[in-house]
Amino acid sequence: MNIRERLGKELLFLDGGMGTLLQAEGLAPGELPETWNIEHPEKVEAIHRRYYEAGSDVVLANTFGANVCKFHDDRYTVEEVIRAGIANAKRAGEQIGKETYVALDMGPTGKLLKPMGDLDFDDAYEAFAEAVRYGEKYGADLIHIETMSDTYEVKAAILAAKENSSLPVFVTMIFDERGKLLTGGDVPSVVAMLEGLRVDALGLNCGLGPKQMLPILNDLRRYTSLPIIVKPNAGLPKQKNGETYYDVEPDEFARIMQEVVKEGACVIGGCCGTTPEHIKKLVEECKDLPLRKIEKKHDTIVSSYGQAVILDDMPRIIGERINPTGKKKFKEALKNEDMDYILKEAITQQDKGAHILDVNVGLPDIDEVAMMEKVVKELQSVTSLPLQIDTVDGKAMERAMRIYNGKPMINSVNGKQVSRDEVFPLVRKYGGVVVGLTIDEEGIPKDAEGRVRVAGKIINEAAKYGIDKKDIVIDVLTMTISSEKDGAKVTLEALKRVREEFGVRTVLGVSNISFGLPRRPIVNSYFYAMAMQNGLTAGIINPSSEDMMKAYRSYNALMGFDENCTNYISTYAGTTETVTVQASQAAAAAGNAPKAAGVEMTLKYAIERGLKEEAHHITRDLIGTREPLDIIQEELIPALNVVGEGFEKGTVFLPQLLMSADAAKIAFAVIKDVLASSGQEEEKKEKIILATVKGDIHDIGKNIVKVLLENYGFDVIDLGKDVPPEAIVEKAVEENVTLVGLSALMTTTVVSMEETIKLLREKKPDCKVMVGGAVLNQDYADMIGADFYGKDAMQSVHYAQKFFGMVE
């Protein structure tokens, strides 16, 4: 029986940890676990068999790191270790006496994807695609993508799985206790994207014990209509007599996992620290528990990598300004590939209150496919707002949907057969919330009845592609009243009927209503209020228009969406009514965007927003009037502090943090060149060594820490990954370094971290050690003798500043 037929109908049991069991069998630090598929197949097979005997329905082949980005061994190819890994798992299940399944286990590449790192999305896709092809070729029953902390990387993996096999796809992500991914994603944004990509089951693994996963499981159940997978660690890692162990024993693990099943999980197993004993007890205690019914959810959600916007009864704003129509300067920016101009438009709208940004780059004389990809990627590096892909070019639409990190809005499909045939397959494949325009082969219906009819046709045709109506928003079209006197009445009637008759969400390009009229914002704002009252979910407007925002804020206050009128009061308390048109509003009417939401474009602002070109130009201008070191202390460092504080509070996400760091790096480079040409010396930089310890090839966290430390003025000596203790100590002595940062992602390599600390204490006793990594916590850091544990990159910066006396 295909595992899809059992999903959600019965409780399925996965296996537990592999790495610690291999280590117990003799796997040496730094040795690639996948090589044991070939060199010690009997030991790998025995571990799989123990899990099957414990009651696992599914075991994961020993292929977690089998991709070209991570697996580097001169003796064996990726194909060879996958073939052997699947064969070992299959042999283990042959004599079990029940139906068993083997999953191709796909872990992360160990690299950050662009723009945060240096791995291209297409290269990540190819790495996963190769593994998938071999997995299906050699008999895997399903693909399990696990321990993912980046939605962009997991999207590459899912597309690789879907496009290169017909196997079921399970996906589990690694969340922290706040319910956040490393790159900032939360539960609703992750669910929106994974469901859009049509995985078979989703959930969480690693990082946390079963008790800590319960709140996140509840969030998953709130948003997903899919079967939920839960694979916790056996609690928290500890050390005793030089051995790593986890603090949740099999009995306690099984007891808590009963709660996990009652709260909605229907595929369960274990991750780090769990053993066949944990799984045996898990099966004994949970096998007879009834499954909680999976409830179908009806939320209309669009998302970015770090933010979900739920289109519900409270109206939302779609910013209209990233569009060349009627905007001379924007057209020039597109032709000249002036990304900073476009990014400032995005930041302006975000600051003014937009929830989603419309993105249209259509010009006759540009390569729209390439430009759309470039603009989408650049926008996602500076804003966490979801995007609406606005194009009539099918190729541009597909490329944007493919490389977009999240679940976008798609603008648009219409009632014409040719449009439906082009757009609906893309929405089915990549996921998205698609805008349905009420126009068909007969044109735009003149009356509300006709537009409602076309809306119904779009919804019904979408269903044939498996697209639920929650992923459709209907645009009944706004016709200008200067040429159609009943245009507003027809639109409002159609709007209301679509909401009432189909129960779908709605969208309108509001400002179309006033073309050809004077003082357009007056008409626009009144029509906007009327549209919201008649069921408008999302208005495509200019959020820099004060008239429109007054209508929006007033409506929300009057309808109770703005609880206690908090937003209205915070915006208007202490202000007075004025008859003058604001500068930003006047600029918008003229087709020229304000510079940056009415904020003076300072170096500090440019760095906070990750505007690299602006940072370069402003720094060059400042050099002529201010001392270089004053610029660093008064502009650069305060800007980095603001971004760092936002990151710690969860209001700034990792991509924005790193883009700000890049902007600061460019400004630093300008200052450094000036100092060098004038014969001045830079201030002496304190040295810090960073290294991922012996046996560990994951250096994402270390690289993030490096970027931030360098921007705060430290001289970072990066020794790379898989670094022996002796090499770290030798460099510390040679360079007389007094602070070393060590990173480890894998439980099995924390022993190397402890050995490194002991050797540093012996050979360089004045050297302090800060540690970080997914498997660590404060207790564990204390046990291995570290001086400081940093749960994120900014904490490492703070410790370094205090250690060197840069702050109190």
Language model region names:
Residues 1-475, 479-808:
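Domain-level signal for soluble alpha/beta catalytic cores
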